[in-house]
Swiss-Prot record:
Regulation: Phosphatidylinositol transfer activity is inhibited by N-ethylmaleimide.
Tissues expressing this chain: Expressed abundantly in brain, kidney, liver, and lung, but in a lesser amount in testis.
Name under which the protein is recorded: Phosphatidylinositol transfer protein beta isoform
Species this chain originates from: Rattus norvegicus (Rat)
SUPFAM superfamilies: Bet v1-like
Modified residues (N6-acetyllysine): K215
Gene designation: Pitpnb
Length: 271
């Protein structure tokens, strides 16, 4: 058995703008999660072409320990809390697989994302068979809804309900911002449809861990997209060439940061 959820994140930007904004935000957020021997190591970031599909391939290693729940740390052997993330970004479609060498075939996280120019109203964009689709829970993430944010994660300067972009004049996002967006044809809009499939086969822990991971994925998607919108003035003028240069610099920074300093960023204890 696997646990599948589809997270839908609506944003007041275009699919084209989001491509740059998402890559910028992921690079910045990675720095906030790296230090003291933990965090993110980038092994590969290169173009790929496979069966007519073209895009950017990345292979990252997540060195975790304090970032997993205590009940997992207690039973996890030394060195087992290392996760490999491989992503094939053929934008506007992206596929990410997370695996663990210790658990082998008993664990994976698969995230498939379609980015569409709509307000999150499309059904089964990933083309699942009807029986599987019936089991999928749909979760709507509202980036302006503070109640969806963990108290420990809240930052006023990353709150779309307070932020207004100087360059685009977008924001602040009020309680009815999605309805207002639907009634404003000239304002860009899009939705990231993120299908998350989780398998964790460990007797006695399976449902507990699968539910924990889905909760963490929602938390990550919520925080990242709130940041993405509030950082729009930092990335809206960037090109993909600028982003690739930034990613190269970030890769070197992460390597240095991971080897020194203290553990940074979100921990499972906050969840």
């Amino acid at each position: 058995m696997v646990l599948i959820k589809e997270f839908r994140v609506v944003l007041p930007c275009s699919v084209q703008e989001y491509q740059v904004g998402q890559l910028y935000s992921v690079a910045e957020a990675s720095k906030n999660e790296t230090g003291g021997g933990e965090g993110i190591e980038v092994l590969k970031n290169e173009p790929y072409e496979n069966d007519g599909e073209k895009g950017q391939y990345t292979h990252k290693i997540y060195h975790l320990k304090s970032k997993v729940p205590a009940f997992v740390r207690m039973i996890a052997p030394e060195g087992s809390l290392v996760f490999h993330e491989k992503a094939w970004n053929a934008y506007p479609y992206c596929r990410t697989i997370v695996t663990n060498e210790y658990m082998k075939d008993d664990f994976f996280i698969k995230i498939e994302t379609w980015h569409k120019p709509d307000l999150g109203t499309l059904e089964n964009v990933h083309g699942l068979d009807p029986n599987t689709w019936k089991t999928v829970e749909i979760v709507h993430i509202d980036i302006a809804d503070r109640s969806q944010v963990e108290p420990a994660d809240y930052k006023a300067d990353e709150d779309p309900a307070l932020f207004q972009s100087v360059k685009t004049k977008r924001g602040p996002l009020g309680p009815n911002w999605k309805k207002e967006l639907a009634n404003t044809p000239d304002c860009p809009k899009m939705c990231a449809y993120k299908l998350v499939t989780i398998k964790f086969k460990w007797w006695g822990l399976q449902s507990k861990v699968e539910n924990f991971i889905q909760k963490q994925e929602k938390r990550i998607f919520t925080n990242l997209h709130r940041q993405l919108f509030c950082w729009i003035d930092k990335w809206i003028d960037l090109t993909m060439e600028d982003i690739r240069r930034m990613e190269d610099e970030t890769q070197k920074e992460l390597e240095t940061m991971r080897k020194k300093g203290s553990v940074r960023g979100t921990s499972a204890a906050d969840a």
